[in-house]
Amino acid sequence: MRLRKKAWTNEFLNQHTYYLIKYDKKINLNEIFLNNNPTCLEIGCGKGQFLTTLALKNPNLNYIGMEKSSTITAIGLKKSLKEFQNNSKKMTNIKYLNKYAENLLEIFYTDSFSRIYLNFSDPWPKARHYKKRLTYLGFLDIYSDILIKNGFLEFKTDNDSLYNFTLEQLKLTNKWEIISNTLDLYNDQELLKDNVPTEYETKFHLANKNIYKIVIKNLK
């Protein structure tokens, strides 16, 4: 169900523009973060739990959370600011971007990111909507362009159809190499040891749903 826009959204975002990416040309990430640390991108960052946990854990990495809903962007940013405050840390390595994945190439240069995360993306179950799925070949080509060579993309889902679709799309390209692939993340100790759960993931795991995960390397 689509979340209705909250009345406070615009005011909150306008008060916190420092943490929002605005652009009229392609973005230089070194200028955005005022450093040259590697940058990771979460596409569809939801309410920010995953992004915030990683940013707190890895202060020498930069993180961008991309979300198409302005209200969810605001909720995520609010959560990030609160968690950093609770940990007595200044939030310097997270920025939020309220845009669609279709806009990636007009926003970012080639080789901008070291890692991309796709967590529990909309499966778009109707066959006619297959090009909207974030692991459709057209999107995979975009990710390959904005990732550095040998950079990684991590994909998690509870949806078996989207998981199988993703594997089929990967067969259509030679730009990627599958590094890890599991049908049950919580019974894969190697992948689980560094796993950071999302809000949805925790909910699905508690409901005894399998979590699928694929990690792929960008071969360019």
Swiss-Prot record:
Family: Belongs to the class I-like SAM-binding methyltransferase superfamily. TrmB family.
UniProt keyword list: Methyltransferase, S-adenosyl-L-methionine, Transferase, tRNA processing
InterPro entries, alphabetized: SAM-dependent_MTases_sf, tRNA_(Gua-N-7)_MeTrfase_Trmb, tRNA_methyltr_TrmB_bact
Active site, renumbered: 122
Pfam families: Methyltransf_4
Stretches of the chain forming a coiled coil according to its record: none
Pathway: tRNA modification; N(7)-methylguanine-tRNA biosynthesis
Binding site for substrate: 126, 158, 198-201
EC number from the UniProt entry: 2.1.1.33
GO cellular component: tRNA methyltransferase complex
Function description: Catalyzes the formation of N(7)-methylguanine at position 46 (m7G46) in tRNA.
Transmembrane segments: none
Keyword Metal-binding among record annotations: no
Known catalytic reactions: guanosine(46) in tRNA + S-adenosyl-L-methionine = N(7)-methylguanosine(46) in tRNA + S-adenosyl-L-homocysteine
EC top class, as a word: transferase
GO molecular function: tRNA (guanine(46)-N7)-methyltransferase activity
UniProt gene name: trmB
Protein name: tRNA (guanine-N(7)-)-methyltransferase
